[in-house]
Amino acid sequence: MLKNIFYIIMGPPGSGKGTQSQCLAEKLGLPHISSGNLLRSAIKASTPLGIKASEYIDEGQLVPNGLVWEIVQETLNKSECLSGCIIDGFPRTLDQAVLLHDFLVKANADYRVIQLDVADEEIIRRIYSRFICPSCNFVYNQSQGFRECPTCHSELVRRSDDTLEVIQKRLESYKNTTASVIDYYADLGKLTCVPAEKSPDEVFQSILACIED
């Protein structure tokens, strides 16, 4: 298992990529970069980027490439990411994939892509049952019975874009934009697909088996 490598975790909204990315980051001792969390932090702080991004996210649309890449690249350039990191929520478009590939090649870094496969029906069920900590961005399932975050004790909330109409838009948008990304990484020999409808622990073990090959 390599540590000095970048792992890109892909999958539709609600596929568990945030949870799996965090688990992998803890296992390998690498930073976890979530473009979604970075954008939400910018929105919460009302930065110029955050204000622009919120208009797209609230409508279930993808944030334009330039806005997302600016904040992701800034984070990747930090010293703690020099030995590798776990990236989730990025790239979502072919343009973003090329930008990230060129950045990593220039940095003489290797990377692998893990695609989490989940059916639409399961995605909708998962998203309807999830709650978010607005402070530390951890995701919890309704079945866990938490009303506040066990870590920071903030009240758990639903995301404003976790409605059926917006979820369906996001799924359709994801499929339309990421098909070319998946093909791009497959052609480069970087892609591994992992079935992700089992329990989080079982999915994580499947991911570990893939990266240990």
From Swiss-Prot:
Signal peptide (from-to): none
Protein family: Belongs to the adenylate kinase family.
HAMAP family: Adenylate_kinase_Adk
Annotated positions binding ATP: G14, S15, G16, K17, G18, T19, R130, V139, Y140, K198
Molecular function as annotated in GO: adenylate kinase activity; ATP binding; zinc ion binding
Pathway: Purine metabolism; AMP biosynthesis via salvage pathway; AMP from ADP: step 1/1
Protein purpose: Catalyzes the reversible transfer of the terminal phosphate group between ATP and AMP. Plays an important role in cellular energy homeostasis and in adenine nucleotide metabolism.
Designated name of the protein: Adenylate kinase
Lineage: Bacteria, Pseudomonadati, Chlamydiota, Chlamydiia, Chlamydiales
GO BP annotation list: AMP salvage
Pfam families: ADK
Positions annotated to bind AMP: S35, R40, Q61, L62, V63, G89, F90, P91, R92, Q96, R159, R170
Complex and partners: Monomer.
Residue numbers binding Zn(2+): C133, C136, C149, C152
Stretches for region LID: 129-162
GO CC, any one term: cytoplasm
